[in-house]
UniProtKB/Swiss-Prot annotation:
Role: Cell wall formation.
PANTHER family: UDP-N-ACETYLENOLPYRUVOYLGLUCOSAMINE REDUCTASE
Listed name of the protein: UDP-N-acetylenolpyruvoylglucosamine reductase
Primary gene name: murB
Key words of the record: Cell cycle, Cell division, Cell shape, Cell wall biogenesis/degradation, Cytoplasm, FAD, Flavoprotein, NADP, Oxidoreductase, Peptidoglycan synthesis
């Protein structure tokens, strides 16, 4: 348990908790100001301790994973930023197809492990630079597959109850009300610490590895992997494709400061070396306004904004 100054000092000395840490190193866009407090817990118990401490101190808590779907303001974030990328590890049963992974486990790592064991269902995830926790919260997906297709449950901590509840809770797939790039976890007090999946066992491992390699090759040749980005910026407004709408307006290569609409894939905004969060935000707004004006279609961002006066 977290006990006053002694517990705080222990977390500071161990490096789990730090002050005034630039968050640009914690996002795939490589932008973002400092966190007032940044914590990288190693397990669920430390998560609980940190949440209890933040609540006692009256600090706002925000949870991030790999930072692959975030735009953090240049001014940074007040309160406690809880980064779960150290919560890594997974258990895969080749016979039953049951999989459990901690929230910070990288999706590509889990996808490759599953393929090597002949477990089918996560091949689409090999090129997504996110974590299991983030994928569970936003229903990450690609190439016709999505997290909701194979996730059976998530283990969560209710941030609003950390002063009375000292354990985690299990929520089923149905509880999460999955939709396209959405779940009830978004905007809630539920913090994912682990997820459970049901994959299909008994598939040919070599064939699955070939498929994952092919999926990764396709993504690296059709998307701008050489520049920092958040992945796809906008949801596809079915039946249209966001990238095609943006490209159709001649917006590829449009630039504000160090932020640029990728010339490789128009639904990517890349940091070409010196972008700020304000540059990226302004370019997102410009693209949205142009598509709305010319096509009458509203593009909704997949990316979550933190630290701005208004958020998505």
């Amino acid at each position: 348990m977290f006990t006053g100054d002694r517990g705080l000092n222990a977390l500071l000395e161990s490096g789990v908790l730090q002050q005034e840490v630039p968050l640009a190193n914690y996002t795939t866009w490589r932008v973002g100001g400092p966190a007032q407090w940044l914590a990288e817990p190693n397990n669920a118990e430390q998560c609980l301790e940190l949440l209890q401490w933040a609540k006692a101190e009256g600090l706002t808590t925000r949870v991030i994973g790999a930072g692959s779907n975030l735009l953090i303001a240049d001014a940074g974030l007040p309160g406690l930023t809880l980064c779960l990328r150290r919560l890594q590890g997974s258990q895969l049963d080749a016979e039953s197809g049951q999989v459990k992974a901690l929230a910070g486990e990288p999706l590509p790592t889990l996808a490759r492990r599953a393929a090597r064991l002949g477990l089918h269902g996560l091949e689409w995830a090999v090129g997504i630079p996110g974590t299991v926790g983030g994928a569970a919260a936003m229903n990450a997906g690609a190439q016709g597959g999505s997290t909701a297709d194979c996730l059976t449950a998530v283990e969560v901590i209710d941030q609003s109850l950390t002063d009375t509840v000292k354990t985690t809770t299990l929520l089923s797939n149905t509880d999460l009300a999955y939709d396209y790039r959405h779940s009830l976890l978004q905007g809630s007090d539920q913090m994912v610490v682990a997820a459970q999946f049901q994959l299909e066992p008994g598939h040919d491992a070599k064939e699955l590895m070939r498929k994952t390699s092919g999926n990764l090759s396709h993504r690296t040749t059709t998307q701008p992997y050489q520049w920092p980005s958040c992945g796809s910026v906008f949801r596809n407004p079915e039946p249209e494709k966001a990238g095609q709408l943006i490209e159709g307006l001649g917006l590829k290569g449009r630039r504000i400061g160090g932020a640029e609409v990728s010339s490789v894939h128009a639904n990517f905004i890349v940091n070409v070396g010196d972008a700020t969060a304000d540059d990226i935000r302004a370019l997102i707004d410009l693209v949205q306004n142009e598509v709305e004006r010319m096509n009458g279609i509203t593009l909704h961002p997949e990316v979550k904004r933190l630290g701005f006066q208004t958020t998505d």
